[in-house]
Amino acid sequence: MAEEKETKKKRRNRRDEILQSLAQMLESSDGSQRITTAKLAATVGVSEAALYRHFPSKTKMFDSLIEFIEDSLVSRINLILKDEKETIARIRLILILILGFAEKNPGLSRILTGHALMFEQDRLQGRINQLYERIEVQLRQVIKERKIREGSAFLHDEALLASQLLAFCEGMLARFVRTEFRYHPTQEFEARWPLIQAQLQ
């Protein structure tokens, strides 16, 4: 029993090591090209066969990274909605969360922008699209609830405002990737925030 637990632990550690290596490769210059299993195996220091003992395909590796992104963002958005009741503060915190997560995880930002998925299965891009749609729905709900919570609605349609807020985040992430991570998504956020807030009328 103890041996079985130890084997599972080692297997989990190796899986994590493979995923961390893939994320690091996405952050490096390799991330702008197609990452092959041969390159990944060399980075991890194992054979390609060893990779496939932990993941049946490279697609499954990307699936695991996307799952981490989903869990990280969605769980933290839920915490924001639980702890913060004021609408504008909620929106601000959600934007900072998305931008900050990408900034702390440059390799994963290539997945969020779709750049790392250009050479992979379309299904993976579909998962990212669904994540953005889910976040947009949450933003729309936050905006819609303002009338109930605070007694006054926004002048503009909640769907329009939610898509505008998400488009801002996507644009900052795209800039981050395009500049090879030189311009951080949270850079000058405090200066930009009044411009964003001016749209929330």
From Swiss-Prot:
DNA-binding region(s) in UniProt: 36-55
Keywords: Cell cycle, Cell division, Coiled coil, Cytoplasm, DNA-binding
PROSITE patterns: HTH_TETR_1, HTH_TETR_2
Coiled coil: 122-147
Single biological process term from Gene Ontology: cell division
InterPro entries in the record: DNA-bd_HTH_TetR-type_CS (IPR023772), Homeodomain-like_sf (IPR009057), HTH-type_Tx_Regulator (IPR050624), HTH_TetR (IPR001647), NO_SlmA (IPR023769), SlmA-like_C (IPR054580), Tet_transcr_reg_TetR-rel_C_sf (IPR036271)
Top-level division of the source organism's lineage: Bacteria
Molecular-function GO terms, alphabetical: sequence-specific DNA binding
The family this protein is said to belong to: Belongs to the nucleoid occlusion factor SlmA family.
The protein's role, per its UniProt record: Required for nucleoid occlusion (NO) phenomenon, which prevents Z-ring formation and cell division over the nucleoid. Acts as a DNA-associated cell division inhibitor that binds simultaneously chromosomal DNA and FtsZ, and disrupts the assembly of FtsZ polymers. SlmA-DNA-binding sequences (SBS) are dispersed on non-Ter regions of the chromosome, preventing FtsZ polymerization at these regions.
NCBIfam families (alphabetical): PRK09480.1
Protein name: Nucleoid occlusion factor SlmA
Organism: Proteus mirabilis (strain HI4320)
